[in-house]
Amino acid sequence: MNAVLADVLNTRRVVARDGSVIPLHSEISVAEGAALQRLVRELQPQVTLEIGCGYGISALYICEALAEVGGRRHIVIDPDQLTDWKSAGLFTVERAGFASLLEFHDLPSHLALPRLEEAGVKVGLALIDGWHTFDYAMVDFFYVDHLLDVGGVVMLDDTSAYPAIRKLARYIATHRQYIPLRNDSAEQPVADPFVPSPGSIRRLAERVFQPRLVYPDATLGLPPDNFIAFRKIADDKRGNGSGGSRRWDQHHEF
């Protein structure tokens, strides 16, 4: 483990750019950091992305592994990094020796992500850990999907802590060409892609009962953990519903 990362985790303190010392909080778990590093080492992406930087712990995990595999760039989007977080996340990553990998966007994600798409940026791994309401997180996923390579992985943080993020995980599992992964491997899916039952009884149940009762998380391959990674198995295609395309009126209860 990088010495700066180890020190921050051991002391539970981070140093801001102005020299002030701040108690560490709101960081990803060690298990999630280890999962991110496994994904980077297995996927070997050239470019990675995260939405929400905070004190830079997730960026440190990603950059450490990205440097090992010869990656070129880690894109960080965080409109509050220079203010609420006192640049502590960026400064910590720089102190760890990964400044050359960083590309920082001091913009809300709904503004930064379309610019990246317009510039033709593609990423192999993305972490969504920004504003935790369903609308903002959904917009983050929508644009990340446009940037993510087929075979790449998107990870959602706080999937058990915030109902809106769990709901987004259910949307991805039921509507898009993604497979949830086991948290110890980038190569082994938890379940096959979701296919809604065509039966009339099941359709009636979907109307009467909550979707989570009809399709429990476990049947969708969603673990109870506080982070879930999804592998993208195909680009999004709009069409008539055949050949993996989505109809203009596609909807499944989720």
Residue ranges and their predicted role:
Residues 23-27, 33-254:
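S-adenosylmethionine/decaboxylated-SAM
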